[in-house]
Amino acid sequence: MVIANSNIIFVAGLGGIGLDTSREIVKSGPKNLVVLDRVDNPAAIAELKALNPKVTITFYPYDVTVPLAETKKLLKTIFDKLKTVDLLINGAGILDDNQIERTIAVNFTGTVNTTTAILDFWDKRKGGPGGVVANICSVTGFNSIYQVPVYSASKAAALSFTTSIAKLAHITGVTAYSINPGITKTVLVHKFNSWLGVEPRVAELLLEHPTQTTLQCAQNFVKAIEANQNGAIWKLDLGRLDAIEWTKHWDSGI
């Protein structure tokens, strides 16, 4: 996918990985970058606008845990303004296994709902033009960090959902791939709660392992966007971008 002159919606585009990725996207010259985030950050929006004045940056407050109908309403506002959208990035995520329901709501249900909502505008069965979904999942969707089983399971669910959406592309016209960062130096991993307090030092122990910067992750994210490979399972770890070959242990046969 060519980012230049495209229209992109980025959910949680002002977070740790999100903000650096927004910067890299803006440098590539899209026509519009629409940022949806729970918390407004005027300074970050101003920085993005200054980075490339030719790009129109728009912000809308958005919490991915709202009902599906509210998400559809917001997307209608965006589509009415832009007419077309080329790429949806779902990047919302929390890491706190004390908040079981919210972890599932943000990391999984929110991704499902935003993707489902945009199908109203993209689905070729409804006369839509199709589109591309990039879902930020996690390497914990491959192999869990067992001290945070709720977080890990939510990311595995998001990965499975994304893979299924990709396989439906011939029906809907919507392609999809997953972005799976490894341990990245963000506020998210500096301090977080394990499930039932099974490992109070989990954040400290995790950061003893090799990590990557948000910039390294963002630069590889843009490479994945440009590759635009339907069904790809991208691992973004230690400053590298690698396509994962998923091992098939069972097939529904349908």
Swiss-Prot record:
Binding site for substrate: S138
Positions of the catalytic residues: Y151 (proton acceptor)
Gene Ontology terms describing biological process: alcohol metabolic process
Pfam family, one: adh_short
Catalytic activity: a primary alcohol + NAD(+) = an aldehyde + NADH + H(+); a secondary alcohol + NAD(+) = a ketone + NADH + H(+)
Gene Ontology CC, one term: cytoplasm
Positions with a binding annotation for NAD(+): 10-33
EC number, UniProt record: 1.1.1.1
Keyword field: NAD, Oxidoreductase
InterPro entries per UniProt: ADH_Drosophila-type, NAD(P)-bd_dom_sf, Sc_DH/Rdtase_CS, SDR_fam
GO molecular function terms attached to this record: alcohol dehydrogenase (NAD+) activity
Subunit structure comment from the entry: Homodimer.
Family listed: Belongs to the short-chain dehydrogenases/reductases (SDR) family.
Protein name (Swiss-Prot/TrEMBL): Alcohol dehydrogenase
Gene source species: Drosophila grimshawi (Hawaiian fruit fly)
Gene, per the UniProt record: Adh
